Each structure stands twice: as structure tokens, then as C-alpha cells.
């Protein structure tokens, strides 16, 4: 998959919403890409997986929020980020929104359901994007 258009849309969203231009750091891997944003009020780390091979019960074509910290309005900004993904991600083939080892309780803010209960309280949550009610 060519990720440049999706990253362009994501960068545009971050610029329009928060005023930061071209702030995504993108790392390609065998499963898809990982995006980091560490600027101003934001600390984001998000995986965009095409293939999960069932790891952590995360489905293929998932957006996995690993870290999403905003200094102000945490819940509002997280919901807005999820709304962006719900609208734009299906255009690029993504079908699910998930969290990984969710100590920050993002799943409560987004209404995600438990999909994997691992050892040592490692819980993953997820939901199809079309079922996301935010």
C-alpha cells in the first residue's frame, strides 16, 4: 500500500486541528506503518497495521492507538482523533480501531470492547470503525 496520501491527510488533520505542520514521523515495517507525533501538546504513537496475523487478537487492517496524550482536553481530542479515523481510514482500507495494553483507559473514552485478555493485565480493546459511536 502507498501510505503517502493517508499520511498527507493525517498531517493535514493535525495542522487544521492543532496548528502543527508536517509533524508525523513515519516508520515502515512488515505489518504496515507506525506514526509518532511528539510536538507541543501532543504525544501520539499509532500503528497502522495491514496484517496482524492474530497477534493480541487484533484484526487485520487495524489502527492501533498505543499512546495518545494531549496536555489539554484529553478526552475531547481523543474522540476527535477517532472521528477523523472513522471518516478517513476506510478510504485506505482500514476497518478497525484498537488500543494495545490500554493502561490509559482510552477504550472507556471511545467505547471499545475487550478483544484480548493477556497475561499481566495486558488487555487489548477494539471495534469496527463503522460501529464507533462518538
Q: Where on the chain are the PLM-derived regions?
A:
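Non-catalytic substrate-recognition and accessory regions of acyl/acetyltransferase enzymes
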Residues: 1-73, 83-134
Amino acid at each position: 500500500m502507498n501510505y503517502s496520501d493517508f499520511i498527507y491527510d493525517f498531517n493535514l488533520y493535525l495542522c487544521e486541528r492543532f496548528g502543527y505542520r508536517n509533524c508525523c514521523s513515519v516508520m515502515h515495517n512488515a505489518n504496515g506503518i507506525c506514526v509518532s507525533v511528539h510536538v507541543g501538546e501532543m504525544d501520539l504513537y499509532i500503528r497502522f497495521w495491514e496484517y496482524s496475523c492474530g497477534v493480541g487478537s487484533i484484526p487485520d487492517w487495524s489502527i492501533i492507538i498505543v499512546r495518545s496524550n494531549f496536555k489539554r482536553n484529553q478526552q475531547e481530542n481523543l474522540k476527535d482523533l477517532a472521528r477523523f479515523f472513522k471518516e478517513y481510514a476506510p478510504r485506505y482500507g482500514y476497518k478497525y480501531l484498537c488500543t494495545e495494553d490500554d493502561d490509559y483507559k482510552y477504550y472507556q473514552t471511545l467505547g471499545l470492547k475487550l478483544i484480548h485478555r493477556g497475561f499481566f493485565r495486558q488487555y487489548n480493546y477494539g471495534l469496527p470503525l463503522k460501529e464507533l459511536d462518538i
